């Protein structure tokens, strides 16, 4: 039985590893339409010892990323589980880079805005070169575990995505 909420579609701004279609395909088991966009009023940071970035509000900041178009509620729950409890899903305004259209979308904001582990600018091209392969292999394992009755907890997900492993 389908509820109307499960049929609702969402647009989600991503700014880290989820910009990569190969990663999204593993996460969602499909590749949705992806458009380039800019998120004003935020800044992206690297996180010490982690393979993924975070964003926090910043008056003069601007983050370039992608919007995943037409994400289902079930897929959004998968993204929520992967992002874990260090991020908060919020609604923000982005500007599409292809047509300058402004849109309200969901994104994941780092909860601890004063986190001492935040530093420097996270670089997508560097991530692809150095970490993409490991990231995809790890997520394939995680998604397989999630399909099993016992599943794998959110804490396990964040621990396997450390730079020092």
Curated annotation (Swiss-Prot):
It is an enzyme of class 2 (transferase). Keywords: Acyltransferase, Transferase. It comes from the Eukaryota. Its EC number is 2.3.2.-. Induction: Not regulated by chemical or biotic treatments. Expressed only in seeds. GO terms for molecular function: acyltransferase activity. InterPro entries: AIG2-like, AIG2-like_dom, GGCT-like, GGCT-like_sf. The keyword Acyltransferase applies. It holds the Pfam family GGACT. The active site is at residue 83. Substrate binds at residues 15-20. Putative gamma-glutamylcyclotransferase. PANTHER family: AIG2-LIKE PROTEIN A-RELATED, AIG2-LIKE PROTEIN D. Belongs to the gamma-glutamylcyclotransferase family. This is AIG2-like protein A. The lineage of its organism: Eukaryota, Viridiplantae, Streptophyta, Embryophyta, Tracheophyta.
